[in-house]
Amino acid sequence: RDRSPSRGLGDVYKRQKEKGLVFGYININQKELTEEGKKAYQAYYCGLCRQLKSNCGTKGQMLLAYDMTFLIVLLTGLYELPNEKTKFTCALHPTQKRIAWINDATKYAADMNLILAYHNLIDDWNDDRSYTRKAFAKMLDKDYTRIMSKYPRQVGAIEEYMKKTGDVEKHQETNLDLVAGLTGEMVAEVFCWKEDEWAEELRTMGFYMGKFIYLMDAYEDYDRDKKKNCYNPLTFVQEEQAQDLDTWCRLLLTSMMSECAKSFERLPILLHADILRNILYSGVWSKYEYLQIKKRRIEEKAKKKEHKQ
């Protein structure tokens, strides 16, 4: 099936990522972060999971997007929000007590998580006529109405994004900047929690991160999409760019993340700044580096096979 710009029962998260409705690339670099930083990030992640359960039960936890933790840490650091700290036993890790940190940013991120997941489920229904996902989405109707009344701007932006990306795929849009910009516009509105003095910088940060996410996803799926003849705007790039796609994409990705980081550095964030910088300057590149290693291994394997023949 065709892939929409940037794509979460059982494989909900995977399907969300394939559609670009969760990020999949915004994570910490474990090797470069202190133990204290890792514990804090995990506590916010556990808090998001607990909040989703509080909002709509176990089904909410099934829609958990790990990447939304970044948004929680960002908003917590910017607004210096106090945490409600609780110890609990996790069903997946029952051997020792876990710690969850929850604040108003957690509640906001959980709401955005549910809206994105809802649209993924509806999209699955439209594409595949999956009655399981239609039924799952139906169970979120009450939550959708609640969140829409609370955050009409953000929900409206996500709805507009879903409509526009459908049109883009249908018409096989070749303008990469235009297509990536759609994800940027949507993420910009999600990052902008409140219309206040920080709104412009948060929007700018979200816009460039959204474009980065879209391009990284298109780059990761390039070979598969070309082979299966699925929509991917990278297949339309000029011949000279296509000859060295890795370098060209790296330059574009670096440019986008540079703009994102500039906006971050203009925000007066001290709390968790180490975690956020770890993600922005290192963690977001983890998948790219993994893909490079994977490509080199495939090339080496092909050379060995050719040499044997």
Show the residue positions of the predicted features.
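An active-site-proximal "capping" alpha-helix that borders the catalytic cofactor pocket
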Residues: 256, 260
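Acidic catalytic motifs of isoprenoid enzymes
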Residues: 14-204, 211, 215-246, 250-252, ...
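Conserved, well-structured core segments
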Residues: 302, 308-309
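Single conserved hydrophobic/aromatic residue that forms the stacking wall/gate
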Residues: 1-13
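Short, highly charged C-terminal tails/helix-capping segments
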Residues: 279-280
